[in-house]
Amino acid sequence: MAFEELLSQVGGLGRFQMLHLVFILPSLMLLIPHILLENFAAAIPGHRCWVHMLDNNTGSGNETGILSEDALLRISIPLDSNLRPEKCRRFVHPQWQLLHLNGTIHSTSEADTEPCVDGWVYDQSYFPSTIVTKWDLVCDYQSLKSVVQFLLLTGMLVGGIIGGHVSDRFGRRFILRWCLLQLAITDTCAAFAPTFPVYCVLRFLAGFSSMIIISNNSLPITEWIRPNSKALVVILSSGALSIGQIILGGLAYVFRDWQTLHVVASVPFFVFFLLSRWLVESARWLIITNKLDEGLKALRKVARTNGIKNAEETLNIEVVRSTMQEELDAAQTKTTVCDLFRNPSMRKRICILVFLRFANTIPFYGTMVNLQHVGSNIFLLQVLYGAVALIVRCLALLTLNHMGRRISQILFMFLVGLSILANTFVPKEMQTLRVALACLGIGCSAATFSSVAVHFIELIPTVLRARASGIDLTASRIGAALAPLLMTLTVFFTTLPWIIYGIFPIIGGLIVFLLPETKNLPLPDTIKDVENQKKNLKEKA
């Protein structure tokens, strides 16, 4: 915790931190559209089989010259159970007799129809083009749409696992810059992917980069911030993610073509990559990894930016070494992921934090995936989701500062669980109430993410924070992958998935009681700091 002494000499919340936030917040805002891009880029428009009599571009398809388009559609495409044109089958031969029959009479058998062997015709009133229309991901191939989302999620999972290790090895700044460039290139190339498999590979790489950007954007700035302002920074960062969802709704509404949307979302990250050269590496990480000269330069640069004039005289290698000697000695022992579980206090903390992340991610993604059933158009729904999450995340800042870390998490997790469980008993006819409860659940789930993130940073020591962050984010990605799979349980009981979504956060809220309160406490740098923190809390109790 000695780094807090050095931070107080260079300024824990000044011009440098503000400039850092000016870079980080916009990059987080524009990152979310990349993660949720398939909500629009892979939208499935209305479609039907291509029919010679209707869709022959030569103009000779309608040989009668007197039949309307509706009449030609009637004799060419069978009706489904809702008396709407089938999306995946057509008549082998025109059924002229249907022109003289009541619309509710079906005089043809399954043998009279065939799949869409000549392709499909898509409704372009909402989206002129999506990856679904480009590669015909409908009917028997509709499941391929979920392959893209699965691979993106898998990329984020792999990024969560690897990101912490490479960041501890090569530094937060270098890995962040690499991933900013990788995301810009891969998602720009995805807009021009020649085949569906190539598109999938590029989206996997985009997911890999996205997760590391989220992690490495948050860690350095929180390490440069004084303890009593860390909650504010985390809330601002998570609030930027919510604003990103609102931005996505607006971008998708303006740029309906999926390729244009990809390019528009990707170009800003080339700019972020160029601007990131002025980012300063975490001095805490530099010192802990025995790069004292570089750490001293970083501290002096921060002091100059913050207007601390006597920093050159007061800050030198001897001061840094003597202040951080205990942490330097502890850091000489190479840390691994196993170190998170060797110490009883660390083992308890990491296991609880991982479960909390997992328990909140399942209802968050479970609710988000099924928001389409609310009935609103997807553009408005995306904006509404982001707006509600942003408002409740701002509320989380007040609860974190006034009620503490533990009580905030308990409050929000209980509200998530109770709102989801209550919604299972609300009739579908009561749409307003269902939407209100769904928004409450999503908003509180977003606030829980912010609360857990603040508590996580204050519970895990610097030497292990990036690796622990990788494990934490891995648990989040696993929860996200499981959330939609739980919907298959509806074959046993229609409300069973929702009951599971509601129970997990309630259990998580109860487990939070096992963690210590860390409000206004300095960040631990080593495992020994964690032990000392534990002793101090016991003495106060």
Curated annotation (Swiss-Prot):
Cytoplasmic side: 1-15, 167-193, 252-259, 371-377, 428-436, 494-495
MF term (GO), any: transmembrane transporter activity
GO cellular component, one term: membrane
Broad class of the protein's primary localization: membrane
InterPro entries for this protein: MFS_dom (IPR020846), MFS_sugar_transport-like (IPR005828), MFS_trans_sf (IPR036259)
Chain positions carrying an annotated carbohydrate: N56, N102
Tissue: Detected in fetal and adult liver, and in adult kidney.
Keyword Glycoprotein: yes
Extracellular-side segments: 37-145, 215-230, 281-349, 399-406, 458-472, 517-541
Similarity-based family: Belongs to the major facilitator (TC 2.A.1) superfamily. Organic cation transporter (TC 2.A.1.19) family.
Name of protein: Solute carrier family 22 member 10
Organism: Homo sapiens (Human)
